Amino acid sequence: MPEHVGKIVQVIGPVVDIKFDAENLPDIYNSIEIDMGDNKKLIAEVEQHVGDDIVRTIAMEGTDGLKRGMEAVNTGKPISVPVGENVLGRLFNVLGQTIDEAGDMNADKYYPIHRPAPTFEEQSVQPEMFETGIKVIDLLAPYQKGGKIGLFGGAGVGKTVLIQELINNIAKEHGGLSVFTGVGERTREGNDLYYEMKDSGVINKTALVFGQMNEPPGARMRVALTGLTMAEYFRDKGQDVLLFIDNIFRFTQAGSEVSALLGRIPSAVGYQPTLANEMGALQERITSTKQGSITSVQAVYVPADDLTDPAPATTFTHLDATTVLSREISNLGIYPAVSPLESTSRILDPRIVGEEHYEVANKVKHILERYQELQDIIAILGVDELSDEDRLLVGRARRVQRFLSQAFSVAEQFTGMKGQFVPVKDTIRSFKEILDGKCDDLPEAAFLFAGTIEDVKEKAKKMMES
């Protein structure tokens, strides 16, 4: 038997034990190929050396049909996936194989999915704002270039549309690229996203990688690394890349399943003892370098809404900003339904975004907080019972709240409203005018889904004429 070939000695679900010669044991994280016949190869990844020249591996696909005594080939390298321009517009699985039935892909380069994080010397230390063109985000919870953003929200509040608009804006305004990684979510959602991206025209600037709910835990645990590896290639070529991970909790969940299968003693709440280490290995690779940046937007599922659960708590330590989508705001018909008071950002700091931006954002938050406090009084007694000062504040707050809405390009075919990318300087100037009372005489309805303050005035003029 050739030196790099071993034999399967045990199969327990997705865990496959393989015996090699003592001198030729494969390294940890090496990929192992098992020939299943009918031109089908099963890939497994080495996780442990268990003694007696046996390695314990986790299969990336179902192990149906595996038998003891079957031959397994050590490839001598980790799982490697295609990178480069050719991956754009295509759908991949954890192994970098295309799953969109659009033919095979010829890739010039393959990168291993396990790679070191950039060194301190390579990293960019200058915090810089990442302009999204979405007013509520840019003003109140701005994203950092190379930062990590947590996206919180229940079903049907607009997470997917927000993600698509971000992909659209980075492609059209910054010429940037995106990688979408579906980790342990529903296959139907991935399918819908693919066709929606096709319809909205952003698919050619995006690579999609999926390891869905029905796949073995090994695939769900590693698929985030596959997407990240594709994004790293573009970053190292000088691009600004958006990396979407939906859902980061499923990455932890898959790691927990694998840990249990490997026989590790669980830690708090049944999670793997290596939770912080696994999360750190992924998150530390997502950063800005002197060449380019990877800005990551991660959907975060919070089990039972318990923020102290180890999985979300470990994720929070890595986040630079949070974007919280609120059902209350979507019920008001305001989209994007981003909660201006619950969303946060580490870079909303006068030294980074500038004094004027910081001041306007704080005033907007203050006026909305006060409006929230007054809502109980308004519900019981009505607006007329408020003092003149509070009545004026409520009027401005309602205008601000409506002006935080925005028409999206990717939703144009459903809403009939032309989408707008609003530069951050226009956003600041427009909100300043509302706060200074220059728009108190304009009707509230004119502020809904307007881009800049000039659009509001234009809409108000048309309303007056009609």
UniProtKB/Swiss-Prot annotation:
Broadest EC class assigned to this enzyme: translocase
Subcellular location: Cell membrane
InterPro entries for this protein: AAA+_ATPase (IPR003593), ATP-synt_VA_C (IPR055190), ATP_synth_F1_bsu (IPR005722), ATPase_alpha/beta_chains (IPR050053), ATPase_F1/V1/A1_a/bsu_N (IPR004100), ATPase_F1/V1/A1_a/bsu_N_sf (IPR036121), ATPase_F1/V1/A1_a/bsu_nucl-bd (IPR000194), ATPase_F1/V1_b/a_C (IPR024034)
Keyword Isomerase assigned: no
Reaction(s) catalysed (UniProt annotation): ATP + H2O + 4 H(+)(in) = ADP + phosphate + 5 H(+)(out)
E.C. numbers: 7.1.2.2
SUPFAM superfamilies hit by this protein: C-terminal domain of alpha and beta subunits of F1 ATP synthase, N-terminal domain of alpha and beta subunits of F1 ATP synthase, P-loop containing nucleoside triphosphate hydrolases
Membrane topology reported for the UniProt record: Peripheral membrane protein
Pfam families: ATP-synt_ab, ATP-synt_ab_N, ATP-synt_VA_C
GO molecular function terms attached to this record: ATP binding; ATP hydrolysis activity; proton-transporting ATP synthase activity, rotational mechanism
SMART domains assigned: AAA
GO CC annotations on file: plasma membrane; proton-transporting ATP synthase complex
Signal sequence coordinates: none
Binding residue positions for ATP: 153-160
Keywords assigned: ATP synthesis, ATP-binding, Cell membrane, CF(1), Hydrogen ion transport, Ion transport, Membrane, Nucleotide-binding, Translocase, Transport
Assembly, per entry: F-type ATPases have 2 components, CF(1) - the catalytic core - and CF(0) - the membrane proton channel. CF(1) has five subunits: alpha(3), beta(3), gamma(1), delta(1), epsilon(1). CF(0) has three main subunits: a(1), b(2) and c(9-12). The alpha and beta chains form an alternating ring which encloses part of the gamma chain. CF(1) is attached to CF(0) by a central stalk formed by the gamma and epsilon chains, while a peripheral stalk is formed by the delta and b chains.
Protein function: Produces ATP from ADP in the presence of a proton gradient across the membrane. The catalytic sites are hosted primarily by the beta subunits.
Family per record: Belongs to the ATPase alpha/beta chains family.
The protein's name in its UniProt record: ATP synthase subunit beta
Gene name per UniProt: atpD
